[in-house]
Amino acid sequence: MIDPTARAWAYLSRVAEPPCAQLAALVRCVGPVEAADRVRRGQVGNELAQHTGARREIDRAADDLELLMRRGGRLITPDDDEWPVLAFAAFSGAGARARPCGHSPLVLWALGPARLDEVAPRAAAVVGTRAATAYGEHVAADLAAGLAERDVAVVSGGAYGIDGAAHRAALDSEGITVAVLAGGFDIPYPAGHSALLHRIAQHGVLFTEYPPGVRPARHRFLTRNRLVAAVARAAVVVEAGLRSGAANTAAWARALGRVVAAVPGPVTSSASAGCHTLLRHGAELVTRADDIVEFVGHIGELAGDEPRPGAALDVLSEAERQVYEALPGRGAATIDEIAVGSGLLPAQVLGPLAILEVAGLAECRDGRWRILRAGAGQAAAKGAAARLV
């Protein structure tokens, strides 16, 4: 028998075109089962009704979950340990919120043995044009193989050209590669990459926010790109024209606070024009895998052995500082209490709290959060980083 909570999540993943901030807010407020019931009965606000009205009577959740289980997959929700909390925390930042669709996914449909929570802290996106040149495919393969050899996961979109070259090289080097799809996991796209996507699902991880049967479309590719950027620490554009999906992924990476990098190419090549534009606007120049590894390193490697608390506070975002200042000087506080003190919604404090924990500035015990002082903070930061890498 299918778990009612899983069935509710599966129903909700189909009822609105993702990402739907209003639907996510309802789920945070009342939980997935109650949210699904309200949506199904049409007992939601006008704004959410506009997003769900056309599909609320479509319930394929049981069939969707059975298909997922037959394929050996899993539904990853924000309640699961595998949910990449730190990676998706970036969607609470101002850069993401300023962009259309700048929201965390509701759920993820995933196939493959690699866990997202373990992969994302040490991953790099290698992306580029479908109409790649021999030069571009050679460089993409060389970079991906080098990353795989250095235990860095390679994230891409499964497309022809640069994406495919990166995925194949990572697999051939016995590394981990991640494919983020713009449609249901049961619709291999492009069809010519069916075998490649199958290999990724066997040895890495393939995931999508779209339920089975949903076909890729142009707007879904652009929406998907935010997840390619989110689950990587850096986005490297190998080849791209002036108007390309890879440039869109780079824009998402910048909005999410990730490192944006590009590979230079011949000045006469239109396939490198987008890369040269990125480089002119401050992207890091990449020519070898070691350049990317410097951007990606383990979280625990980003700080010195003895970080100064003052310096750590200096680099906090506005939301992270609000949450830090809402923590009590003595004792501990619940998520709801921190939300009240910071002026943020409960869901908006989760990402900043994860950042504070990794930075050794806060810790959670028995569901309550407290400030950490310098000595304890260093030990806690190492423990938090160890759980993430």
Curated annotation (Swiss-Prot):
SUPFAM superfamilies: MCP/YpsA-like (SSF102405). Induction: Induced when cells are grown in human macrophages (THP-1 macrophage cell line). GO terms for biological process: DNA-mediated transformation. Belongs to the DprA/Smf family. May help load RecA onto ssDNA. This is Putative DNA processing protein DprA.
